[in-house]
């Protein structure tokens, strides 16, 4: 783990609320929100739209604690480069508000609480998956890949794809092909998401020596790979409809619509790979895309939604049958 660099000046907390705020910031709550949304999507799909509110609360809480633990350890490890990068230098550790040792104790406490909560109130599989997410994010991505491989995001993206597996396991006690497809969707979504950001802040990554794809291969190659991953991603999302049959018509239509917008934005970046505004637009949309895709999964999985689509399908078949009878 990296120690906070020496010229980071300590800052005192003036009250207990500032202490809570600093430790809260260590968990990177904005990242956790998206992870919890994918967890919920996994739960609803796995339970076919009928999820216990208590189990939902327990699983999301356990997932949030596990993600917070991983993020806090990441903050410890990256405190040296966080101080250099403009957007991260005021994080709790590089700014001196939290000591690395205290952050580690905090992270381990979160992880232990998460494991206990998920084991007792969900099941052991969900708990072990949550812990594997911490190990992969810290050990494989943060320690091994981030500063040493241009494929850091491609391989490391698996850590961010574990939450839907946790959600699915919490409600079913097992992992089906559909659960692994959710995992694969997020793995493939991750490179376009992060590489768009990397184009936007390429100079910062270059300054601290992180080998992101735009730094090593340039913006044009990065935009090309974003385009390829996007073209793979969109058809993958429709595999939930066929052949897996875990999502229906509403999901198919809206997932296609969201995907078309994603493709359009990736195409715009391909045509103008050095345009930071276009890269930033794609990065922001990729977040909305994943949130909305998961929301559509949840809506489509609800029992009353299936009732509506079934009624519409029956009405359409009746209409077509009547029209054919009149014509022939």
From Swiss-Prot:
Molecular-function annotations in GO: protoheme IX farnesyltransferase activity
Pathway assigned to this chain's UniProt record: Porphyrin-containing compound metabolism; heme O biosynthesis; heme O from protoheme: step 1/1
GO terms under cellular component: plasma membrane
Subcellular location: Cell inner membrane
InterPro entries found in the cross-reference section: Protohaem_IX_farnesylTrfase, UbiA_prenyltransferase, UbiA_prenylTrfase_CS, UbiA_sf
Keyword Transferase on entry: yes
GO terms for biological process, alphabetical: heme O biosynthetic process
CDD domains linked: PT_UbiA_Cox10
EC number, as in UniProt: 2.5.1.141
Membrane topology qualifier: Multi-pass membrane protein
Top enzyme category: transferase
Disulfide bonds: none
Listed Pfam families: UbiA
Superkingdom field: Bacteria
Entry keyword set: Cell inner membrane, Cell membrane, Heme biosynthesis, Membrane, Transferase, Transmembrane, Transmembrane helix
Residues that span the membrane, as ranges: 31-51, 53-73, 120-140, 153-173, 181-201, 226-246, 250-270, 285-305
Reactions the enzyme catalyzes: heme b + (2E,6E)-farnesyl diphosphate + H2O = Fe(II)-heme o + diphosphate
Keyword Metal-binding attributed: no
Additional record remark: Carbon 2 of the heme B porphyrin ring is defined according to the Fischer nomenclature.
Function: Converts heme B (protoheme IX) to heme O by substitution of the vinyl group on carbon 2 of heme B porphyrin ring with a hydroxyethyl farnesyl side group.
Annotated family: Belongs to the UbiA prenyltransferase family. Protoheme IX farnesyltransferase subfamily.
Name of the protein described by the UniProt record: Protoheme IX farnesyltransferase
Native source organism of the sequence: Trichodesmium erythraeum (strain IMS101)
Lineage: Bacteria, Bacillati, Cyanobacteriota, Cyanophyceae, Oscillatoriophycideae
Gene symbol of the encoding locus: ctaB
């Amino acid at each position: 783990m990296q120690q906070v660099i020496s010229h980071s000046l300590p800052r005192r907390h003036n009250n207990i609320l500032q202490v809570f705020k600093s430790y809260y910031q260590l968990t990177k709550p904005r990242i956790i929100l998206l992870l919890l949304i994918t967890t919920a999507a996994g739960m609803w799909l796995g339970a076919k739209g009928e999820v216990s509110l208590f189990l939902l609360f327990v699983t999301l809480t356990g997932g949030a604690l596990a993600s917070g633990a991983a993020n806090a350890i990441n903050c410890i490890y990256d405190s040296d480069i966080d101080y250099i990068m403009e957007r991260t230098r005021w994080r709790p550790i590089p700014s001196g508000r939290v000591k690395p040792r205290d952050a580690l104790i905090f992270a381990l406490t979160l992880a232990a609480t998460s494991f206990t909560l998920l084991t007792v109130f969900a099941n052991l599989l969900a708990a072990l998956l949550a812990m594997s997410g911490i190990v992969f994010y810290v050990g494989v991505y943060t320690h091994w890949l981030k500063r040493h491989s241009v494929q850091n995001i491609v391989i490391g993206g698996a850590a961010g794809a574990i939450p839907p597996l946790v959600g699915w396991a919490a409600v079913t006690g097992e992992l089906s092909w559909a659960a692994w497809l959710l995992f694969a969707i997020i793995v493939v979504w991750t490179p376009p998401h992060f590489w768009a950001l990397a184009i936007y802040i390429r100079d910062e990554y270059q300054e601290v020596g992180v080998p992101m794809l735009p730094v090593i291969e340039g913006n044009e190659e990065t935009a090309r790979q974003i385009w390829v991953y996007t073209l793979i991603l969109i058809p993958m999302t429709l595999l939930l409809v066929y052949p897996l049959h875990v999502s229906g018509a509403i999901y198919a239509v809206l997932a296609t619509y969201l995907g078309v917008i994603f493709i359009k934005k990736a195409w715009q970046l391909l045509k103008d790979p050095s345009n930071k505004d276009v890269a930033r637009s794609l990065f922001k949309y990729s977040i909305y895309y994943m949130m909305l895709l998961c929301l559509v999964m949840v809506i489509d999985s609800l029992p009353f939604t299936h009732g509506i689509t079934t009624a519409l399908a029956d009405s359409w078949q009746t209409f077509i049958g009547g029209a054919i009878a009149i014509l022939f």
